[in-house]
């Protein structure tokens, strides 16, 4: 029924629950699961010049967090015997990036949490 499942993650507990749900579905249907982490490359538009974090620092932290989160998700999926992939996607519109990735990989299903962290909230 579901050959390719997409799981957007953000390092939150809610995203971890989505990975767990995707594992159950993947085991039931023999699916491959791809975890993605969307990084907004321009989160500071309209914030002002006195923001304590610079663009380069933000991107370095965001990429490191993406790598850590994706590796944890991939390890969890593989430990459960699920074929797993992982992608970092740059996109100013997270929901659009998720949908575009789902289309590009041929995802049959998107499993995601609804109350994770996002944007500047991660840095606070």
Place the predicted regions along the sequence by residue.
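Glycine-rich, Arg-bearing micro-motifs that act as flexible, cationic patches
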Residues: 109-124
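Short, well-ordered secondary-structure micro-motifs
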Residues: 18, 45-48, 96-99, 122-123
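Short glycine-rich, flexible loops that bind phosphorylated cofactors or substrates
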Residues: 14, 94, 118-120
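Structural beta-alpha unit
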Residues: 75-110
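Short, hinge-like loop/turn segments at secondary-structure boundaries
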Residues: 50-54, 102-105
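Hydrophobic alpha-helical membrane-association signature
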Residues: 18, 66-69, 94
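A short acidic, glycine-rich active-site loop
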Residues: 54-68
